[in-house]
Amino acid sequence: EVVEEFNVFNTDVIETTEEIPDIQTRSHITYKVTKLNRTSEIGAYTGQSVSGEPGVTISLSQMKATSFSASSNVAWNVKGKAQATLGFNFSKSYTIGHSGSRKVPSTHNGRKVKRAELKAYRLYDKHTFKVTWTSIHVKQPQYYGTYWAKKPSGYHYKMVYYYK
């Protein structure tokens, strides 16, 4: 068994849940969120797969769209500021569809293919960010923590080849 992997990013992400209102603190603390980096992260297997024999075109459009949520490990008191800086709500659920097709080759890596299976995994944009704070009494920025937030961005596919 040999695996090839590729990502399909979806720009038509549909937000499907209501926004949760931000909790505002009454303190005089000001938080600053600084973006550090953004990477792609492969999530859980969706349970969706399709397989076929050589010469058959396996269609991804037969797979249904799935809904999965954004998430974060950010502290509740800086969540609103972090969401505004990154541009998405960490509590929303997103529905992402996918479509396309791939023909199963008769040979792969010089070997005869018995069948191939295409498996779909969730794909996230993972943002890492740093939070600092100041107040009316503390002017020098103080480190508060480093956090992450993930937003659904598409699907990661694994094409598994089984040989004769």
Where are these regions (language model features)?
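N-terminal prepro-regions of secreted/extracellular proteins
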Residues: E1-S51
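Polar/charged side chains located within well-ordered beta-strands of beta-rich proteins
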Residues: E4-E5, E15-E18, K64, K92, ...
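A residue-identity detector for tryptophan
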Residues: W76, W133, W148, Y161-Y162
